[in-house]
Each structure stands twice: as structure tokens, then as C-alpha cells.
């Protein structure tokens, strides 16, 4: 996804290596990326398949110098139907010496277009580490087939905890988001049909705590490393076990504990990939009022070109906003 490309770029730069990196993805002008590539001369280019093919076809960087290819979330790329685009990328890189395919779940087979005849499997999972004692599974029963009110009560009960709600379709994400907002519940939405700026703003606010709840499709289930997510809610159940594993993988990360909630109406049953019956989570008859976030994000669309710096902004918040140092 675009967000995963941006996240990898940010993490790579935060490591302070001597190697320069550039991220390339849709939703913004390719010409700006070309200028950045030309000016930076990066050692690492991180990109989505479509945008990478765009730059390769225009010869915006020298494909002959690329010796290493890494495909992150490889199995999901196949599931999303990116085989042709990935094959086209590989076909334009004549001097590849190493190919890495990364995923949290195993692929059934390696397609021929990868050019991998003999593979070496590296497994970084610790077989002795059990997630079950850190991830707590619950089912929440909805008296109505339309589970909106049950979701609302659950989120009110969870209060200010960071919660990621998964729906199976973009339209459902929009519908759930609008309903919660109509109930004065502050939440963000995230799906592939949104404008890139809106997607990034939703993630930014969720990361920094100015939004406790994010409603998303499975776009947020892969790769995105958002720390301290306390709860995952399956408003809709995923189609398969891999989807369930990756969704739950957004919580209980790095030795932390987390909770996974499955909302079921009377006609729904648990799928076969959920082997153990989850404990039922009983909602209170009268849920608490929606919790307000502790922080608010202000977007200031000005910068150095407008002769505005960080000191000006902080001074404005002190003098005009009457804020204290510990409030910023």
C-alpha cells in the first residue's frame, strides 16, 4: 500500500544509515518524485508496483544499477492481483542478484515471475513465543442484524483505548464512520478509495492519539506499524484465516497485551478458522458517553516559504491560545 511505502521510508531514514532512500506511490504527482530521485540519487527506492513501473518505463532511474529486490507483504500483493505489475517490474531489472519475499504468513507457492528457482526460507518467528497469553479473544452478540448500535456501545465501553475496527468493504467503512459521527463519536476512516491526503491525515491523527478509533478495510491489516493499539474489532469477519491473523496482528505487539472482539448477530456463526470459542463480552445496559481524545491535531498549511517557523507557531499557541508548555 501507499502508506506502507511511506512508513518504510520514514523508518529507514530514522535509522540514520549512510544510504539515502526515496518513496514512490500513487496519489501524488510522479513528476515531483522524479525530481526528488534526480536530486537525491537514492540507494534505496521504496514504491508501490504501479508507481514503480511508471518510473521504470520513463527511465526516471537507471534500472541497470538495481541488484536487490524486496517485495514486502508478498502474499497480499498476489491476493490483490498485482502479479502482472510485479512481473513487469522484475522484467525491467536485468541485473538482479538477490530477491527477497517478505510476509507474516506463508505463501502456498512461489510464482515463476519472481525468478526464484531455489529459495532459502528465513523464519524469524520464535516457536516458543506464544501470542495466546497476550491476545485476549472475545465475542460480542448483537441483538440486531445491523450491528451499528452494538459497535457504538462497545466503543463507548472501551472508552479512550486505541481501537481499530475492520469492515470488509469501503462502503461499510463510510457507513459505520457516518453513523458514529452522528452519535457524536469522534473517529477516523481509512480505505483505498480515499484521497491520499485524507488517508494520511486519518492515520496521523490515529497515531498521535487525537483520534482513538479508526474504521478501516483490510488496507490497515498489513504492514502498518501503529504502536499501542489496544483493541481490534471485527465488525465483519474476514474471508480467511490469514486475514484474521493479520488483523489481530495490529494489537498485542512487542510484548504488549491486546484484545480482539468479534461482533456477531443472531444468524452469524464463528468460521472454522476460529478454533476456540471466544469468551462472551457482556455490554452494559447503559454504556458510558463517548470518550473525547486527550489531544487535538491542528494543521497549519504554511512553512519556510511563507517565513513561518516552529518558534512562530509555538509563540502563537502560547500568546493567543493561552496554552502551557505541557499542553503542546
How would you describe each model-predicted region?
Residues 213, 240-282:
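Conserved segment of the helicase C-terminal RecA-like domain
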Residues 14-15, 61-128, 273-275:
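Post-DEXD/H (motif II) to motif III coupling segment of the RecA-like Helicase ATP-binding lobe
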Residues 283-328:
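Non-catalytic terminal extensions of ATP-dependent helicases
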Residues 65, 213, 222-237, 259-263:
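A short beta-strand element within the Helicase C-terminal
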Residues 133-181, 312, 316:
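Conserved interdomain hinge at the start of the Helicase C-terminal
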Residues 2-57, 65-68, 175-190, 201:
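Conserved nucleic-acid-binding Ia/Ib motif block in the N-terminal RecA-like helicase ATPase lobe
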Residues 27, 108-154:
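Interdomain hinge/linker at the junction between the two RecA-like core domains of SF2 helicases
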Amino acid at each position: 500500500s501507499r502508506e506502507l511505502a511511506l512508513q518504510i521510508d520514514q523508518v529507514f531514514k530514522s535509522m540514520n544509515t549512510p544510504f539515502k532512500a526515496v518513496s514512490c506511490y500513487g496519489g501524488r504527482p510522479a513528476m515531483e518524485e522524479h525530481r526528488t530521485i534526480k536530486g537525491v540519487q537514492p540507494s534505496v527506492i521504496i514504491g508501490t508496483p504501479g508507481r514503480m513501473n511508471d518510473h521504470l518505463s520513463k527511465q526516471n532511474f537507471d534500472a541497470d544499477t538495481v541488484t536487490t529486490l524486496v517485495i514486502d507483504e508478498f502474499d497480499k500483493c498476489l491476493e490483490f492481483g498485482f502479479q502482472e505489475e510485479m512481473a513487469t517490474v522484475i522484467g525491467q531489472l536485468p541485473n538482479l542478484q538477490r530477491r527477497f519475499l517478505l510476509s507474516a504468513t506463508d505463501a502456498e507457492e512461489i510464482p515463476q515471475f519472481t525468478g526464484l528457482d531455489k529459495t532459502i526460507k528465513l523464519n524469524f518467528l520464535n516457536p516458543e513465543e506464544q501470542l495466546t497469553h497476550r491476545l485476549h479473544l472475545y465475542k460480542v452478540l448483537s441483538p440486531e442484524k445491523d450491528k451499528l448500535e452494538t459497535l457504538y456501545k462497545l466503543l463507548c465501553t472501551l472508552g479512550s483505548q486505541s481501537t481499530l475496527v475492520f469492515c470488509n468493504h469501503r462502503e461499510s467503512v463510510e457507513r459505520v464512520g457516518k453513523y458514529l459521527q452522528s452519535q457524536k463519536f469522534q473517529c477516523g476512516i481509512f480505505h483505498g478509495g480515499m484521497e491520499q491526503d485524507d488517508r494520511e491525515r486519518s492515520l496521523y491523527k490515529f497515531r498521535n492519539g487525537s483520534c482513538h478509533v479508526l474504521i478501516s478495510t483490510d488496507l490497515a491489516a498489513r504492514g502498518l506499524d501503529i504502536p499501542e493499539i489496544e483493541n481490534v474489532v471485527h465488525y465483519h469477519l474476514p474471508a480467511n484465516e490469514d486475514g484474521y491473523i493479520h488483523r489481530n496482528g495490529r494489537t498485542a505487539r512487542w510484548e504488549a497485551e491486546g484484545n480482539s472482539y468479534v461482533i456477531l448477530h443472531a444468524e452469524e456463526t464463528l468460521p472454522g478458522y476460529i478454533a476456540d470459542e471466544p469468551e462472551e463480552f457482556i455490554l452494559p445496559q447503559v454504556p458510558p458517553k463517548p470518550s473525547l481524545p486527550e489531544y487535538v491535531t491542528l494543521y497549519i498549511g504554511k512553512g519556510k516559504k511563507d517565513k513561518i517557523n516552529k518558534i512562530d507557531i509555538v509563540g502563537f499557541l502560547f500568546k493567543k491560545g493561552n496554552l502551557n508548555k505541557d499542553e503542546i
